[in-house]
Every structure is written in structure tokens, then in C-alpha cells.
Amino acid sequence: MATTATRHQDSKLSEKAESILAGFKLNWMNLRDAETGKVLWQSTEDMADPKREHKAHVPKNLLKCRTVSREINFTSSVKIEKFRLEQRVYLKGTIIEEWYFDFGFVIPDSTNTWQNMIEAAPESQMFPPSVLSGNVVVETLFYDGDLLVSTSRVRLYYD
């Protein structure tokens, strides 16, 4: 009996995740030098789409920034109780950084802009763009509380 109840609960959670994903769209994203405010890269591609690995060509001078500001603009047709992201940065398949971001409550049928600051590793720990380009994948896990809604991957190229 408990197994049936667990399966029913898992099914409801899966339906909730599918509903959130179906109603979620990443409208645009940009990366800025946090010190100057200058936009270094922007995209209108929906990089939250989990069906494929995305590609982003970013300028190599992004690696010289001490702090990067990331803005994402997204729309959700459904309520999200505790929207949050977990990001893992992989270099040739090995995790080199992890970040955690909490947005909180998302109103149904709303469009939101979310800004995060990301501090660079010390210069002595930075790899050159030639080593990183094409070898870095940023994996983003989208959650509502503890419910995993989607996972997307973006391969970075430093031009």
C-alpha cells in the first residue's frame, strides 16, 4: 500500500515539475562587468530548454572581470513557491565551481528580472581562455523548493 502511495506522490510531483517547465521561458540573459556596468554578452535564446546542450560565445575579457553581474529575465505562467537555481561549472567533465541562487516566490503569469553577482576566482587560479574555450559546461538545475524542474547545459566558448 505504501508503494502505491509513494508512486502516486511521485507522479504528482512529476506532473507539477512538467507544468512548471511547460509554463517557464527564459526571455533573455546578459552578463555585465559589475564594476563598470558594461554589458559584455547578451542572448535571447531560451537556454533553460533541457532538450539540448546550448552554446554561448562570450568575450574572453569577461575572464578579467573581478565580479560579473548576471541578469536573467523569465516568464512563468504558473506559481513557483521557492524558485532557485543550482549551477555547476565543469571543465572537461570535472566540477570546478558550484553556485546557489534563491529567487523565492514567483507569481503566476508574471515576467521577472533577476540579477546575481558572481565573483571570479583569484587571478592565480584562473585558466587561460584557450584552455577553457569549448571545455567549460555550465549545468543549471532549476528547482521549486526541493523539486527538480529541469536541468540545462550551456557550453562556453571564449572569443
UniProtKB/Swiss-Prot annotation:
Gene3D superfamilies: GMP phosphodiesterase, delta subunit. GO terms for biological process: sensory perception of light stimulus. It comes from the Eukaryota. It holds the Pfam family GMP_PDE_delta. GO terms for cellular component: cytoplasm. InterPro entries: Ig_E-set, PDED_dom, PDED_dom_sf, Rhodop-sen_GMP-Pdiesterase_dsu. Belongs to the PDE6D/unc-119 family. This is Phosphodiesterase delta-like protein.
